[in-house]
Amino acid sequence: MCQAMTKWDFKERPLHERPQAEQDAWWAEVRAANAHVCRRLREACGMELDSVYDLVNKHNNYPQAIPTLLELLGEVDNPNIKEGIVRALAEKSAIGVAADRLIQEFRRVAPHNPGLGWVIGNSLAFVARKEHVPAILALLNDKRFGDARQPLPDALKVADRSTAVAACRWLLEDPDTRWCTLKLIGRRKLTELGEGVKRIADGPKHPMQRDAAKVYAKLIESTPGAD
């Protein structure tokens, strides 16, 4: 099992400002974790990769790799390589299959690494099915996860309309989830939420205000009897 060094915390001091020996040790750890992932995928699936990010950038439709990628989530702790594994799971053949494992990983990672938590949430929103909505709503309602929750409202694309509307009402009030919620409202044309969207559109100038105005215009167009 590849274990990440717990001493790596770059909030106070970025990697490039650290002594060369520490930088070398960091990259050695990244290379070791990546080699482990590539070896496992080669042995399990016959895939020849230079990096786990080859799956993200060069490949699509690799159902044979999904079970091994899910196992690797528990084997690799290096955040750089774990991010590649998580991003590789945002793949059509992982829909439904990877969601439960990503929910577990989100709970474990997001409180102390919101950046990686955000990536996990993004992949989770992609692979979630209707049966995962209650667990995802619980994550969205837990403020301990902070802005790692930002992409999770997109998972409500698979929810019943009534569930999506009810959830989006309170998600619009949360600064961490508001923007993604607006986009979901626009895509699903949740006209029941027009008043809340208009309130944001009429608010202080901000890129989100412009997006809210566009969403509100789309909702008006979708409202029966609208001029």
What is the predicted function of each stretch?
Residues 105-106, 202-205, 217-219:
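Short, intrinsically disordered/low-complexity patches at protein termini
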Residues 174, 198-205:
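TPR/TPR-like (Sel1-like) alpha-helical repeat modules
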Residues 37, 68-71, 100-106, 135-140, ...:
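Buried hydrophobic core positions in alpha-solenoid tandem helical repeats
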Residues 10-28, 39-62, 71-75, 80-95, ...:
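Structural detector for internal amphipathic alpha-helices that build alpha-solenoid repeat scaffolds
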Residues 110-111:
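Ankyrin repeat arrays, specifically the small/polar loop and inter-repeat linker segments at the C-terminal end
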Residues 1-6:
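Non-catalytic, polymerase-adjacent accessory regions of viral genome-replication enzymes
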Residues 34, 62-66, 95, 99, ...:
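Core helices of alpha-solenoid repeat scaffolds
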